[in-house]
Amino acid sequence: RQMCIRDSRYGKNFIKAREAHITDPRSDIYNTILYPKTGADLPCFGMDLMKFSEKKVILVFDFQHPREKYLFSVDGLPKDDGKYRFFEMGNHFSENIFVRYCKPDEVDEHLPMFKQYLTEYKKMVELNDPQGEDTTVYADFDKYMTELDPVRGYLKGKFGEEKSESFVNDFLSVSYTHLRAHETRF
Protein backbone atom coordinates (compact mmCIF):
# COMPACT_ATOMS: atom_id res chain seq x y z
CA ARG A 1 0.00 0.00 0.00
CA GLN A 2 1.27 3.41 -0.85
CA MET A 3 -0.13 6.89 -0.67
CA CYS A 4 1.59 9.98 -1.96
CA ILE A 5 0.08 13.42 -1.37
CA ARG A 6 1.46 16.63 -2.75
CA ASP A 7 0.64 20.31 -2.34
CA SER A 8 2.33 22.86 -4.54
CA ARG A 9 2.07 26.36 -5.89
CA TYR A 10 1.86 26.48 -9.66
CA GLY A 11 1.97 29.37 -12.10
CA LYS A 12 1.07 33.01 -11.89
CA ASN A 13 -2.70 32.44 -11.67
CA PHE A 14 -2.87 29.67 -9.08
CA ILE A 15 -2.61 29.63 -5.30
CA LYS A 16 -2.44 25.90 -4.91
CA ALA A 17 -2.63 22.58 -6.69
CA ARG A 18 -3.42 19.57 -4.54
CA GLU A 19 -2.71 16.01 -5.66
CA ALA A 20 -3.32 12.71 -3.96
CA HIS A 21 -2.30 9.38 -5.43
CA ILE A 22 -3.17 6.17 -3.59
CA THR A 23 -2.14 2.77 -4.87
CA ASP A 24 -2.36 -0.79 -3.70
CA PRO A 25 -2.55 -4.11 -5.55
CA ARG A 26 -6.29 -3.72 -6.31
CA SER A 27 -6.84 0.01 -6.58
CA ASP A 28 -5.28 3.13 -8.02
CA ILE A 29 -6.81 6.47 -7.08
CA TYR A 30 -5.67 9.86 -8.34
CA ASN A 31 -7.21 13.18 -7.27
CA THR A 32 -6.22 16.73 -8.06
CA ILE A 33 -7.75 20.16 -7.50
CA LEU A 34 -6.42 23.40 -9.00
CA TYR A 35 -7.13 26.51 -6.92
CA PRO A 36 -6.97 29.75 -8.92
CA LYS A 37 -5.82 32.97 -7.33
CA THR A 38 -8.71 35.04 -6.04
CA GLY A 39 -10.49 38.21 -7.10
CA ALA A 40 -12.07 36.89 -10.30
CA ASP A 41 -14.79 34.63 -8.81
CA LEU A 42 -13.47 31.56 -10.64
CA PRO A 43 -14.08 27.92 -9.82
CA CYS A 44 -11.44 25.38 -8.93
CA PHE A 45 -10.90 22.51 -11.34
CA GLY A 46 -11.12 19.05 -9.83
CA MET A 47 -10.45 15.62 -11.28
CA ASP A 48 -10.69 12.11 -9.85
CA LEU A 49 -9.61 8.93 -11.59
CA MET A 50 -10.45 6.00 -9.33
CA LYS A 51 -9.77 2.38 -10.25
CA PHE A 52 -11.23 -0.02 -7.71
CA SER A 53 -10.84 -3.26 -9.68
CA GLU A 54 -10.18 -4.54 -13.17
CA LYS A 55 -13.86 -3.94 -13.88
CA LYS A 56 -14.61 -0.66 -12.11
CA VAL A 57 -13.24 2.82 -12.74
CA ILE A 58 -14.95 6.06 -11.77
CA LEU A 59 -13.89 9.18 -13.63
CA VAL A 60 -15.00 12.62 -12.40
CA PHE A 61 -14.02 16.13 -13.45
CA ASP A 62 -15.72 19.41 -12.73
CA PHE A 63 -15.56 23.14 -12.16
CA GLN A 64 -15.90 23.35 -8.38
CA HIS A 65 -16.93 26.84 -7.34
CA PRO A 66 -15.82 27.98 -3.88
CA ARG A 67 -19.08 29.85 -3.32
CA GLU A 68 -21.71 27.78 -1.54
CA LYS A 69 -25.15 27.42 -3.17
CA TYR A 70 -23.89 28.87 -6.45
CA LEU A 71 -24.77 26.97 -9.60
CA PHE A 72 -21.87 27.39 -12.00
CA SER A 73 -22.25 26.37 -15.63
CA VAL A 74 -20.26 26.55 -18.86
CA ASP A 75 -22.19 26.78 -22.12
CA GLY A 76 -21.24 24.20 -24.71
CA LEU A 77 -20.28 21.49 -22.23
CA PRO A 78 -22.56 18.59 -21.27
CA LYS A 79 -24.86 19.10 -18.32
CA ASP A 80 -25.26 16.38 -15.73
CA ASP A 81 -28.68 14.78 -15.45
CA GLY A 82 -28.54 14.63 -11.64
CA LYS A 83 -28.44 10.87 -11.36
CA TYR A 84 -25.22 10.98 -9.32
CA ARG A 85 -26.74 11.91 -5.96
CA PHE A 86 -23.36 12.13 -4.24
CA PHE A 87 -22.60 15.35 -6.13
CA GLU A 88 -24.98 18.16 -5.20
CA MET A 89 -25.02 20.56 -8.15
CA GLY A 90 -24.94 24.16 -6.99
CA ASN A 91 -23.18 23.26 -3.78
CA HIS A 92 -19.61 23.57 -5.04
CA PHE A 93 -20.33 21.27 -8.01
CA SER A 94 -21.29 22.67 -11.41
CA GLU A 95 -24.06 21.72 -13.79
CA ASN A 96 -21.28 20.36 -16.00
CA ILE A 97 -19.94 17.74 -13.61
CA PHE A 98 -18.71 14.83 -15.71
CA VAL A 99 -19.05 11.42 -14.03
CA ARG A 100 -18.50 8.15 -15.84
CA TYR A 101 -18.24 4.53 -14.76
CA CYS A 102 -16.12 2.38 -17.02
CA LYS A 103 -13.47 -0.31 -17.21
CA PRO A 104 -9.74 0.53 -17.16
CA ASP A 105 -9.37 -0.07 -20.90
CA GLU A 106 -12.21 2.43 -21.58
CA VAL A 107 -10.71 5.42 -19.72
CA ASP A 108 -8.99 6.82 -22.82
CA GLU A 109 -12.38 7.13 -24.53
CA HIS A 110 -13.08 10.05 -22.16
CA LEU A 111 -9.80 11.87 -22.82
CA PRO A 112 -11.24 14.17 -25.54
CA MET A 113 -13.94 15.39 -23.12
CA PHE A 114 -11.37 15.91 -20.36
CA LYS A 115 -9.26 17.98 -22.76
CA GLN A 116 -12.34 20.03 -23.68
CA TYR A 117 -13.08 20.78 -20.01
CA LEU A 118 -9.45 21.64 -19.31
CA THR A 119 -9.31 23.91 -22.39
CA GLU A 120 -12.44 25.75 -21.19
CA TYR A 121 -10.90 26.14 -17.75
CA LYS A 122 -7.63 27.46 -19.18
CA LYS A 123 -9.59 30.04 -21.22
CA MET A 124 -11.50 31.12 -18.08
CA VAL A 125 -8.31 31.61 -16.10
CA GLU A 126 -6.45 33.41 -18.89
CA LEU A 127 -9.40 35.71 -19.64
CA ASN A 128 -9.89 36.70 -15.99
CA ASP A 129 -6.19 36.67 -14.98
CA PRO A 130 -6.78 36.24 -11.22
CA GLN A 131 -4.07 37.81 -9.04
CA GLY A 132 -5.58 37.92 -5.52
CA GLU A 133 -4.19 36.05 -2.53
CA ASP A 134 -7.25 36.22 -0.23
CA THR A 135 -7.60 32.53 0.54
CA THR A 136 -10.54 33.03 2.89
CA VAL A 137 -12.79 32.58 -0.17
CA TYR A 138 -11.80 28.89 -0.09
CA ALA A 139 -12.53 28.26 3.61
CA ASP A 140 -16.12 27.01 3.16
CA PHE A 141 -15.16 25.06 0.05
CA ASP A 142 -12.30 23.27 1.80
CA LYS A 143 -14.46 22.53 4.84
CA TYR A 144 -17.28 21.14 2.68
CA MET A 145 -14.91 19.03 0.59
CA THR A 146 -13.16 17.70 3.70
CA GLU A 147 -16.47 16.63 5.26
CA LEU A 148 -17.78 15.16 2.01
CA ASP A 149 -14.62 13.50 0.75
CA PRO A 150 -15.25 9.78 0.24
CA VAL A 151 -11.53 9.13 0.56
CA ARG A 152 -11.96 9.23 4.36
CA GLY A 153 -13.71 5.83 4.50
CA TYR A 154 -11.42 4.33 1.90
CA LEU A 155 -8.29 5.46 3.77
CA LYS A 156 -9.66 4.26 7.09
CA GLY A 157 -9.98 0.76 5.68
CA LYS A 158 -6.49 0.87 4.18
CA PHE A 159 -4.41 2.77 6.74
CA GLY A 160 -6.47 2.89 9.94
CA GLU A 161 -8.47 5.68 11.52
CA GLU A 162 -5.58 7.76 12.86
CA LYS A 163 -3.74 8.07 9.53
CA SER A 164 -6.93 8.61 7.55
CA GLU A 165 -8.13 11.40 9.85
CA SER A 166 -4.68 12.98 9.79
CA PHE A 167 -4.70 12.99 5.99
CA VAL A 168 -8.23 14.33 5.65
CA ASN A 169 -7.96 16.97 8.38
CA ASP A 170 -4.35 18.07 8.02
CA PHE A 171 -3.74 17.71 4.32
CA LEU A 172 -7.05 18.37 2.60
CA SER A 173 -7.63 21.50 4.67
CA VAL A 174 -4.00 22.66 4.69
CA SER A 175 -3.51 26.27 5.77
CA TYR A 176 -2.51 28.43 2.84
CA THR A 177 -0.37 30.64 5.07
CA HIS A 178 1.86 27.66 5.81
CA LEU A 179 1.76 26.25 2.31
CA ARG A 180 5.02 25.25 0.75
CA ALA A 181 5.52 22.63 -1.88
CA HIS A 182 5.53 19.42 0.09
CA GLU A 183 4.91 15.75 -0.25
CA THR A 184 3.84 13.16 2.30
CA ARG A 185 4.00 9.41 1.92
CA PHE A 186 2.24 6.78 4.03
Where do the protein language model's features map onto the residues?
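Membrane-targeting and insertion segments and their boundary/processing signals
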Residues: 84, 88-92, 129, 138, ...
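Mature, well-folded catalytic/scaffold domains that follow N-terminal targeting or propeptide regions
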Residues: 36-41, 110-132, 142-152, 172
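Extended, non-transmembrane interaction/recognition domains
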Residues: 39-40, 44-124
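Short Lys/Arg-enriched alpha/beta "domain-start" segment
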Residues: 2, 6-40
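Alpha-helical oligomerization segments
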Residues: 135-176
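Conserved small/polar residues in nucleotide/adenosyl-binding loops
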Residues: 1-7, 177-186
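Short, local alpha-helical segments
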Residues: 101-104, 130-138
